[in-house]
């Protein structure tokens, strides 16, 4: 059985991120294109969050509305991880990329702590791609998500993702 690397991407689809909508669409297309080279060794899971969270398709147009409610995205991420655990027996280290805007609503603490109870999230590689100048709540949320300020990045390129996936393959 093949070993699968799961890539989970959380995208802020609130009104606050309207100005980055086209950039996000391009980035999601590039992520999907990067995974085409993996040919069944990696799965891409894209979760958009605002007042409600939903699964996104990389080639369908992103619509923005609502507030940047990160807790909704984290709850759906927890459900997706548990679902993947049932069906992917041979998993490698997971990759989590959070594309956040400059604002986050409060209430993200409890869902994030529940995620740290899942081994896929606790031992996964976690990055934040942040747009704009973040407020103190966004800074706290992003720092806690990555557990390291050096993983809060201004961008995350297609090349970085492919090299990260190949390094995971070499370790496993």
Tell me what each language-model feature is:
Residues 65-67, 103-148:
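VWA/integrin I-like adhesion module and closely mimicked acidic/polar interface patches used
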Residues 35-38, 88-89, 116-124:
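Arginine/glycine-rich "motif VI" loop of SF2 helicases in the C-terminal RecA-like domain
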Residues 60, 114, 133-172:
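Von Willebrand factor A/integrin I-like adhesion domains
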Residues 18, 38, 50-82, 86, ...:
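Short, charged loop segments at secondary-structure junctions
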Residues 65, 91-92:
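A contiguous binding-surface segment within folded domains or other stable secondary-structure elements
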Residues 46, 126-128, 150-154:
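Conserved beta-strand scaffold positions in the cores of enzyme catalytic domains, especially
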Residues 27-30, 72-80, 110-111, 163, ...:
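Well-ordered alpha-helical segments embedded in enzymatic catalytic cores
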């Amino acid at each position: 059985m093949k070993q699968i690397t799961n890539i989970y991407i959380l995208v802020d689809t609130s009104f606050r991120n309207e100005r980055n909508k086209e950039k996000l669409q391009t980035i999601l297309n590039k992520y999907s294109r990067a995974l085409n080279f993996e040919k069944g060794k990696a799965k891409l899971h894209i979760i958009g969050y605002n007042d409600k969270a939903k699964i996104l398709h990389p080639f369908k147009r992103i619509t923005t509305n609502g507030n940047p409610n990160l807790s909704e995205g984290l709850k759906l991420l927890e459900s997706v991880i548990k679902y993947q655990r049932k069906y992917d027996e041979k998993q490698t280290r997971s990759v989590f990329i959070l594309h956040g805007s400059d604002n986050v609503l409060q209430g993200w603490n409890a869902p994030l702590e529940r995620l740290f109870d899942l081994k896929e999230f606790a031992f996964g590689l976690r990055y934040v791609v942040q747009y704009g100048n973040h407020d103190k709540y966004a800074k706290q949320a992003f720092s806690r998500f990555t557990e390291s300020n050096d993983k809060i990045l201004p961008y995350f390129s297609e090349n970085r993702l492919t090299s990260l996936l190949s390094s995971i393959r070499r370790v496993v």
